[in-house]
Amino acid sequence: MKKYLLILFVIALAISACTAEEPSASLTGAWKLTGYGPADAQTPAIADVDAGLTFSEDGTVTGNSGCNGLGGVYTVQGDQVTFSEVTSTLMACDDPRMAQEDAVQQVLTDTATFKIEGNTLTLTNNDMVLVLTR
């Protein structure tokens, strides 16, 4: 009897290991910024800069807005990602880069809704939307 219980336990453990990933795990990795702005008026990300975000498994986020480097902490609950302790360098850049910087900073100020479809991540905070790809 104990032998059968052990076999059932191992099978149940194997099945539970095959369940869907948590949303935080799917956020993990590097994402390149491709667009930003209100949902109905997206602006393409500046092509000649390496703007994007990297979500680590340890709950930290790092990246570049196209003007300044940034870092902070994130937590996920359902389809909400909450950013905290976000800091960035304080360089001044030309107007297009500063507009992109402002959009990234606006989304990272608090809690954003996120959606992943294929290789595209959408972060929305109030009226500001960031679109990123893997």
Language model feature labels by segment:
Residues 4-134:
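Lipid interaction determinants
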